[in-house]
A protein has these predicted regions:
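Helix-helix packing/entry segments at the starts of transmembrane helices
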Residues: 9-10, 97-103, 172-191, 223-259
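Hydrophobic transmembrane alpha-helices of multi-pass small-molecule transport proteins
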Residues: 48, 52, 72, 111, ...
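Glycine-/small-residue-enriched transmembrane alpha-helix faces in small-molecule transporters
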Residues: 1-38, 73-76, 84, 146-175, ...
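Juxtamembrane helix-entry segments on the extracytoplasmic side of multipass membrane proteins
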Residues: 4-8, 30-38, 62-68, 140-165, ...
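Specific transmembrane alpha-helical segments of multi-pass solute transporters/efflux pumps
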Residues: 55-95, 101, 137, 219-237
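Specific alpha-helical transmembrane segments that line the substrate/conduction pathway
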Residues: 35, 42-46, 86-119, 239-258
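Transmembrane alpha-helices of multi-pass small-molecule transport proteins
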Residues: 31-80, 107-108, 165-169, 185-203, ...
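Hydrophobic/aromatic residues within transmembrane alpha-helices
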Residues: 29, 36, 40, 88, ...
Length: 297
């Protein structure tokens, strides 16, 4: 059991560290956002097709028509999420875009309450309030940015839109229980290829090896390999540990943004980032619920 937990922890850590470098590869590629997402889907689809074939997930009859359509719908949301998140990096910075993106658990809670009738506890509302205060701190710091204030605010709005689309995708995927997650991911990126092919800039393909290397890495490593590591870890780890290790992602992204691009967060931004990540961790780990049960019992 210890070996399983150790392996799962290593897989989850590796997956989150890989995720933390996505923004760097997006910006280094030097390509328009739609082209970056398109090529990520192309190379990711090729990688996941190979992985699904090796795992035996391509056999006929594995998917019903409803399951397939839901997976396609989740793919539309995931691809839109990538477009908005990647667009936020050049406007609000990788660190801020990633931090704001981490409000997604709260959006998922809100959507579940709206569409599934799930109740929102006082504890979750408290964490939501803290995350909102963090957002206010980040937004109020727009004057400190070297870029125009409007671009900074647009970057935050794009990251929020990305988080909302991810929450929609997660809500749809909840209905795909029992479907191999690698196959869901394959359908999602194939959906992205079909959606973005008409918008891809075929007349101005990347001209440098750096651009192609970045796009290949985003497709093969950040999509194919990362999904295998992530889903492997989720199968081995308890939910609480999975949630805790997931915060390696934003921390890694903040460090990459600082080391690679010299983007240093101001005091208000640090306060906002810390508040959002603390609130997300508190809600995912259920902090406060145990105390409340003790008091009421």
């Amino acid at each position: 059991m210890d070996n399983i937990l150790r392996r799962g922890s290593l897989e989850m850590t590796a997956a989150m560290l890989i995720s933390g470098t996505i923004g760097w590869f997006v910006l280094v590629s030097g390509q328009p956002v739609l082209d970056v997402v398109f090529w990520r889907c192309v190379f990711g689809a090729a990688t996941l097709l190979l992985i699904c074939g090796l795992f035996g997930f391509l056999r006929p009859g594995l998917l019903s028509r409803t399951t397939f359509l839901l997976a396609v719908l989740s793919g539309v949301a995931i691809v839109g999420n990538w477009v908005l998140l990647f667009a936020s990096y050049s406007r609000a910075s990788i660190a801020i875009g990633t931090a704001v993106y981490n409000v997604q658990p709260f959006m998922l809670v809100g959507l579940a309450a709206l569409f599934l009738g799930e109740k929102i506890s006082v504890q979750k509302l408290s964490w939501l309030g803290l995350a909102f205060l963090g957002m206010l701190a980040i937004v109020s710091a727009h004057g400190e940015q070297g870029v125009g204030g409007d671009q900074y605010l647009l970057g935050i709005a794009l990251a929020l839109g990305a988080a909302l689309l991810y929450a929609f995708a997660a809500l749809i995927i909840k209905r795909l229980t029992g479907t191999p997650p690698h196959l869901i991911a394959l359908i999602q990126v194939c959906t992205g290829v079909l959606l973005l092919a008409p918008w891809a800039n075929w007349s101005a393909l990347p001209q440098t090896s750096t651009a192609w290397a970045s796009l290949l890495t985003l497709g093969i490593v950040h999509t194919g390999v990362m999904y295998v590591l992530l889903y492997g870890a989720i199968q081995k780890l308890p939910t609480a540990l999975t949630g805790a290790l997931s915060f390696i992602y934003p921390i890694a992204a903040i460090l990459v943004d600082w080391l690679a691009f010299g983007h240093r967060l101001g005091l208000l931004q640090w306060i906002g980032v810390a508040a959002i990540l603390l609130a997300a961790a508190g809600m995912q780990q259920g902090w406060g619920s145990a105390t409340r049960k003790t008091v009421t019992s």
